[in-house]
Amino acid sequence: MLWAHCGRFLRYHLLPLLLCRLPFLLFFQRPQWAHGLDIVEEDEWLREIQGATYQLSIVRQAMQHAGFQVRAASVMTRRNAVDLDRPPLWSGSLPHLPVYDVRSPRPLRPPSSQHHAVSPELPSRNGIRWQYQELQYLVEEQRRRNQSRNAIPRPSFPPPDPPSQPAEDARDADAERAESPHTAESTVSHDASDNAVRRRHERRRYNALTVRSRDSLLLTRIRFSNQRCFGRGRLRHPAGSGPNTGGPRPGGAGLRQLRQQLTVRWQLFRLRCHGWTQQVSSQIRTRWEESNVVSQTATRVRTWFVQRTTLWRRTWVPGQNPAAEAQELAIIPPAPTVLRQNEEPRQQLTGEETRNSTHTQREEVEDVSREGAREGNDGSRASGNDERRNNAGRYDDDHEVQEPQVTYPAGQGELNRRSQEENEEGGPCESPPMTTNTLTVACPPREPPHRALFRLCLGLWVSSYLVRRPMTI
């Protein structure tokens, strides 16, 4: 039996091996084959497969290390959770294993120099792709630069100094100047502290610049500047060219420029008056939502959380509404002191009368306290309001908070200080104390720390739901 096995081994295995290898060993003697090792030349296909497998293994190891889980995903999941700006790593590695990419708003593929350039499709009316808009803007910009690169540069003069802050709007009248890029592309920030009447929310939505599109503020700004540079009513000569600036064409702005400027100003004015109500701003994509592709439910959850945990307080900024401050409309007037029926406004008193009056005051106070005890409220009704308003000892940083600053009309503070010194020196005490219209400007009360901590924790918990889903291949 053993001999038969050996014979079989010789016949089937060893003999073919010798027949294959012996001619090489005899005729093509080479030093690297002398030791009989088999050196297989890897063909291209094998190398490619191995490279791809190696890459995939590296990717999987890295993802495992980072705590991702790799699992197959349905088409809908891929459609929602794929990052639109980057095609996945492994789509380009193997040309003969095509990866079919199903994603609904498809980003433009990078143009290849080998193919005929396809004309980009026009943005549809109802859904404008914001990536495409931005790309369009950049392309236009580069085209303009390339055109002006070969032109003969004209001598230009530096623009005049920008006006100081309060005179910001005075530049429309006399001195024209080139808009700084900051002024050219900026949205007007508007704090909701005006004394104006708020309209119904339908009207406010109707007045908005973007009504129903989820179109970013960034985009609106780009669209405005694009219209200003390339649109139908664009400025044919730059904004700085005017009588007071040197420039390519001296002389005032033409009618079209004026109309265009008026239009833009009017739009911005509407935007300011309307002041981004929550109704509209919830429909506008924030830059955070643009850079992270987020489902609508996640956005809604985030909005809900922000609305519940943000303290909305109308604050009053000093100097904001000078007319109202002059009449002291911004301040709640103190409650008027009610005189008793038998009481008359006090005259100046001598020393003896002062003693008598304090005595009668004491009696009145005792009277009132007896009545309060009879009614069973112990005066708590009177003092409860003050207790509620007194937040001393409520915050950790009470020692750092300054007293509310008191603003006097011009020169009044000095008069007060003098009269106080006179009183301290024992001057004429009979002179009536000066009544001043004091304006108290105080900051709105802050959030207590435990509420801030609650907001932080709730935010962390909710934002854990907004993290991208586990990565899919």
Curated annotation (Swiss-Prot):
Composition-biased stretches (Pro residues): 155-165
Function, in words? Plays an essential role during infection by modulating mitochondrial ultrastructure and thereby increasing bioenergetic potential. Mechanistically, alters cristae architecture by interacting with components of the host mitochondrial contact site and cristae organizing system (MICOS) complex.
Q: What is its main location?
A: host cell
The leader peptide range reads: 1-35
Q: What does the UniProt keyword field contain?
A: Host mitochondrion, Host-virus interaction, Signal
**In which residue ranges is the amino acid composition biased (Gly residues)?**
243-254
Listed under GO cellular component are: host cell mitochondrion
Q: What's the protein here called?
A: Uncharacterized protein UL13
What organism does this protein naturally occur in?
Answer: Human cytomegalovirus (strain Merlin) (HHV-5)
Question: What is annotated about its quaternary structure and interactions?
Answer: Interacts with host MICOS complex subunits IMMT and CHCHD3.
Where found in the cell? Host mitochondrion
Which segments carry the region annotation Disordered? 142-201, 232-254, 331-437
